[in-house]
Amino acid sequence: MAAVDSFYLLYREIARSCNCYMEALALVGAWYTARKSITVICDFYSLVRLHFIPRLGSRPDLIKQYGRWAVISGATDGIGKAYAEELASHGLNVILISQEEEKLQAAAKHIADTYRVETLVLVADFSRGREIYAPIREALRDRDIGILVNDVGAFYPYPQYFSQVPEDTLWDIVNVNIAAASLMVHIVLPGMVERKKGAIVTVSSGSCCKPTPQLAAFSASKAYLDHFSRALQYEYASKGIFVQSLIPFYVTSSGAAPASFLHRCPWLAPSPRVYAQHAVSTLGISKRTTGYWSHSIQFLFAQYMPEWLWVWGANLLNRSLRKEALSCQA
C-alpha cells in the first residue's frame, strides 16, 4: 500500500512539474491549428476570387488592355487552339503558329468565319531550332502584338523511363519546350515594352510542381517555363507587361496521353474549350495559376503533400497511362 501511495505522489509531482510544458505544447498546437485554418480559408478565398468572381462580371476589353493582335504557338490542337478561339471571341486578331499548314489554314478559316477577326498563319517547325525564328521575327515586325501565348510543346508519346525515351524526343523537348518560348518572348517583348503594355502567357504543366518520374525531361522543361515566366514578371511588371505562368493539369486534348478514365471526369480534366474560357478569365489577375478551378485544388494538394507521396502517385498514374497507351498500340 505504501508503494502505491509513493507512486501516486511521485506521479502528482511529475505532472505538476510538467504543467508548464503541457501549457506551452497546447499553445503551440493552437497556433499551428489556427495557422493551418487561416491558410485553408485564404486558399479557398483565392480559388473563388480567381476562378468564379471574374466570370460573373462583364468581359474585359483585352484589346484596350493589351493590344490588337495575339500570337499563339501550338495553335492547331488542344489548349493552344482553344485559347486562340477564346481570344478571338474577345475581338483580338490572331496569328497562329504551328508546323501543320493544313490544320493551320482550317483553324484560321474557322476563327475568321466565326468571330469576324483577322487571322494570319505562320508555318514553323520549332524542333528545327534557330533557323525558323528569322521569318517569324519578320512576319511580326511592326504589328501591335498585345498577347503572346506560348503553348507549343513536345511530349513523350506516353510516360516512359528516361533511358527508354528516343533521343529525337529529348531534342524536341529542348528545342520546342524550352527554346521556343524563350525566343518567342525575345521577339515580341521589345515592342510590348515600347508600347508599355502587353501580356505573355506561357503554358507550363502540373508535372512541374515536383520531380515527376517517367516524365523526367518533360517535367523538368516545364519547370524551366514556370521559373522563366515568374522571373520575367519581376523584370517587366514595372514596364506595364503582365507575365503569367499557366500550369494546367490534365486536359482532354488529342495531344495528351490517352487516358479514358480522365475523359470520364470532365470536372477533373476539362475540354480544351472549357479550360481556355476559364484560363483567359484569369489574365491580368493571377501571375501564376492553373487556369481552372479543379486544377487549382489539385495544385494545392500537390504543394502540401510530401515529395514521396507525389512520386508514389505519379508512378501509379504514369504506369497506368503507359499500360493503356501500349495496349492501344497492340
From Swiss-Prot:
Q: Which domain of life is it from?
A: Eukaryota
GO CC annotation: intermediate filament cytoskeleton; mitochondrion
Task: Give the InterPro entries listed for this entry.
Answer: 17-beta-HSD3-like (IPR052149), NAD(P)-bd_dom_sf (IPR036291), SDR_fam (IPR002347)
Pfam assignment, any one: adh_short
Q: Which CDD domains match?
A: 17beta-HSD1_like_SDR_c
Residues binding NADP(+) are 74-80, 125, 222
| Keyword line | Acetylation, Mitochondrion, NADP
- State where the protein is found: Mitochondrion
The record's region (Required for mitochondria translocation) falls at 2-82
Quick one: where is this thing mainly located? mitochondrion
What cystine pairs are annotated?
Answer: none
Q: Which residues carry this modification: N-acetylalanine?
A: 2
Q: What is said about its interaction partners and assembly?
A: Interacts with STYXL1.
Listed PANTHER family:
INACTIVE HYDROXYSTEROID DEHYDROGENASE-LIKE PROTEIN 1
**Could you say which protein family the record assigns here?**
Belongs to the short-chain dehydrogenases/reductases (SDR) family. 17-beta-HSD 3 subfamily.
Give the protein's recorded name. Inactive hydroxysteroid dehydrogenase-like protein 1
State the organism of origin: Mus musculus
Lineage here is: Eukaryota, Metazoa, Chordata, Craniata, Vertebrata
